[in-house]
Amino acid sequence: MGYKPKYAASSRKREPDVIRTKPEPEKKPSRPKKAQSKAGRIFQIILTVILVPVCTFASVRLLGWMLETVGRPKAAPVAKIKNMGALDDFDAYVEQAMSQADSGLKVSHLGLTEQTEPTQEETEPVRQHYTIPADALVAPKPNPSCYGQVVSPAEMEPILKNAKWILDGQKTYFQTNQQIYEDSFIRYYLDDSIFAVTWQEVHDDSVYTFSEIKVEDASQFRRHLADGQYGSDTQYLTTEMAETVNAVVASAGDFYRFRNFGAVVYQGEARRVEGTYAETCYIDRNGDMHFTRGGEVLTTQAVQDYVDEHDINFSLAFGPILVDNYELVEHTWYGVGEITEGYARAALCQMDSLHYIVVTANTTGPHQSIPTVAQFAKNIAATGCRMAYCLDGGQTASIVMNNDLVNRPVYGQQRKISDIIYFATAVPEGGTDNG
């Protein structure tokens, strides 16, 4: 028997070796590179052109100083750097370079080339404050170029932007998405002392004409009596009186000569008191509205005391009160104005300081309804006004802008009346075109 090695190969065929390779790691999807902004690219250039030489210069200076100190005995004091002026120059250079880098970054961010950030004086020019003298019988003439007219509320956006300084942070009821009466126009006026915009809306199938006004000075909110004096029996159209006194916007007043009703105050003097149930509106010399209710002031002296206490300029005697301190006022009875019946209406509203709306409600075109006082008050309160008061309605209810009648009075024509309220420019003849 032959010798067989202990580890002799088996007769079983050997399977070929399998070459195993490590699985390739799964590659995560790379994130797309974020596009670098213009400011970022400029900042990189600034780093390369300015900061790299600065750092190189600093490194060389530091290396030179280290070489000077090599081999110096430990106990030896470190010598004072001889040329301190060079380091001062270096510090100044670095400070200047950093300042230039910061300025360059600001310029690139603003998309400017040679301009720096505008100063407050450049963006908000100082404006002169105008006032109408107390003894002036008429106001300055408006500048014709300051009037304008558009069809779409959106077209008023640049006008509202230019009026921001005179609005002084106050919001307007008029908005660029306002729903206006079909086929109507939006009229406006803007100069250095007054902004006014007039338009029409439809509410409860009545056409409401709004004129929103913001003035710079209380002297621009005025009352005019026919012939410029108390007690005149002469009567004029609203458009005629508005043109006489150079009104930007005017509204019929309380028709004081037609009714012996309420307290009449003109030029700070109590003239007449009649009708114990009357609610009276007073305008003080700051341009703010005040109210008295029926029975609160019953004599001329009592009215004069009220005038002196509140520094009242003039009054309006019709009513009733619609909104008092943002609260809707309800009435079940009032002596004038047929409050529970449909009637053409007019009102004066105060939105904020030196900020007003005059409004009428009439029938126009297919819209042939006219409101009760309750309906009228509801729509007036929706403007967000602080105070609101009914003026004489019916055929008297009229609003005039640029000497043109804007609304459609009863029977389609104005009535001759004895007084108006109006808003005027205070800029001396000619005004300033800010439109």
Which stretches of residues belong to each language-model region?
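Proline-rich, Ser/Thr-phosphoregulated intrinsically disordered regulatory regions in large mammalian
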Residues: 3, 8-10
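Active-site-adjacent helix-turn-beta-strand microarchitecture at beta-sheet edges
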Residues: 251-333
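Conserved, well-ordered active-site substructure
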Residues: 261-283, 331-386, 390-391, 396-435
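Zymogen propeptides
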Residues: 2-3, 15-275, 279-280
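Short, solvent-exposed aromatic-acidic interface loops
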Residues: 226-231, 296-298, 361-365
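Beta-strand-turn-beta hairpins that frame and shape the catalytic cleft
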Residues: 206, 218, 288, 350-357
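A short, polar/proline- and glycine-enriched secondary-structure boundary/capping micro-motif
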Residues: 232-235, 299-306, 367-374
